[in-house]
């Protein structure tokens, strides 16, 4: 099979090596590249949502990915997930959103969902995605948002342990509240999972479900390429 090529659009310089290692294990010979603009999040936060300038920049990045020969483009940030719906129409390459499989999993588990994030701009798009998936299945979703800005501030100040502590305390409180699922709305929260094995409520993070679906798509593309 021909090796597939994926381009991942990022809004932060997250641990790329974990993503590359996961995809290379699942997809033989895959070429993984990244386009990262770390100013996107601050621009979205400053304006309360994606501006036309943010949309235009991400559309240019998607077109650059297409020109580079990518077989698949991945939107890896929930905050700009709705922007992906726009730029997907401007390229002739399939676009996948990292959090869509997680949203589908949340809907499959029930209708009462807790959403936790450290950025307010992440919660709205994540909730709307879950509600959209639920509506497609005839379900009215009840999403409750939990914003932990102090965790974000701790991370930006160089205190990841404090970031993790704040989030884990909050998640353990949510575990007592009878939700059908707790959605960790930022892919970076995957790092918390090993320390949250005591949580009984299904705890969802987009890394494994999202990149698992992306790996399946890349293998499908490779088979088609021959």
Where are these regions (language model features)?
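Non-catalytic structural scaffold of enzyme domains
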Residues: 1-226
């Amino acid at each position: 099979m021909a090796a597939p090529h994926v381009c991942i659009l990022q809004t932060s310089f997250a641990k790329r090596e974990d993503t590359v290692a996961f995809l290379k294990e699942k997809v033989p010979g895959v070429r993984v590249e990244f386009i990262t603009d770390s100013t996107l999040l601050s621009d979205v936060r400053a304006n309360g949502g994606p501006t036309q300038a943010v949309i235009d920049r991400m559309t240019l990045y998607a077109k650059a990915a297409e020109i580079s020969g990518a077989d698949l483009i991945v939107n890896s940030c929930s905050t700009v997930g709705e922007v992906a719906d726009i730029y997907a129409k401007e390229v002739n390459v399939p676009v996948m959103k990292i959090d869509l499989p997680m949203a589908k999993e949340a809907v499959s588990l029930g209708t009462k969902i807790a959403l936790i994030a450290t950025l307010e701009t992440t919660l709205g798009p994540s909730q709307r995605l879950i509600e959209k998936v639920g509506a497609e299945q005839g379900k009215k979703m009840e999403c409750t948002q939990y914003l932990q800005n102090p965790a974000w501030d701790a991370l930006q100040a160089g205190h990841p342990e404090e970031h993790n502590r704040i989030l884990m305390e909050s998640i353990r409180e949510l575990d007592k509240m009878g939700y059908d699922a707790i959605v960790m709305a930022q892919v970076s929260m995957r790092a918390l999972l090993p320390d949250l094995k005591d949580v009984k409520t299904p705890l969802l993070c987009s890394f494994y479900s999202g990149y698992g679906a992306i790996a399946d798509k890349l293998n499908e593309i490779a088979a088609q390429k021959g």
